[in-house]
């Protein structure tokens, strides 16, 4: 396919995805590739390209696991293209995607209390508050939380993007206080009004919370989409 860029094919790949949450993850990868090398093709994305992309992500302040997610998305597109006989090239045979181990335990009640009451720096307050909101809303997934429409009353009803399962949550006073503090224009919270992509916000959230004393943010309030 002469003249067809990797981004051109990625756009078609994204269109075939049914779930909005999945689409958004690949849209994020598309943005990174567009910033790094918008004219990349299946032919030019080789071992050396992957290494340069990985280093560029690192220099841009992205974490190991966040970078790994983007690389796995690129790999998924290659696998799909190979299955559909679009290309026979596969640069991942000799490229190992790095992964940073995370603590497998959950935060204890004492950890959460310490995090809630911790005297954080000004820039960390929002990240701490949003994490606590995830906890107050029974571990709601980030993609679901940030896409909720403006709140009406004191109940949240939503379908989880990953499973399509219906949930109903009562908003307790502690959660309501945070929601009102970061009220959005088009959504319940202002995260997507400001960041446009929830993955960018989550990256900053994890980085900020890891600097709050010895309290570590674990799990992003549920499994990452």
Language-model features: where?
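Basic, Lys/Arg- and aromatic-enriched nucleic-acid-binding interface segment
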Residues: 68, 87, 93-142, 146
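Conserved tyrosine-mediated DNA breakage-rejoining catalytic core shared by Y-recombinases
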Residues: 146-181
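Short, basic (Lys/Arg/His-rich) helix/loop patches that form interaction surfaces
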Residues: 122, 206-225
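Short, contiguous acidic/charged loop-to-helix segments that flank catalytic cores in large enzymes
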Residues: 120-121, 157-167, 192-201, 220-225
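Major-groove DNA-contacting interfaces characterized by cationic-aromatic clusters
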Residues: 177-208
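N-terminal DNA-binding recognition helix of tyrosine site-specific recombinases/integrases
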Residues: 32, 40-45, 59-92, 138-140, ...
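Short, leucine-enriched amphipathic alpha-helices that occur as contiguous helical runs
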Residues: 26, 112, 126-128, 202, ...
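Basic/aromatic-enriched alpha-helical hairpins
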Residues: 2-60
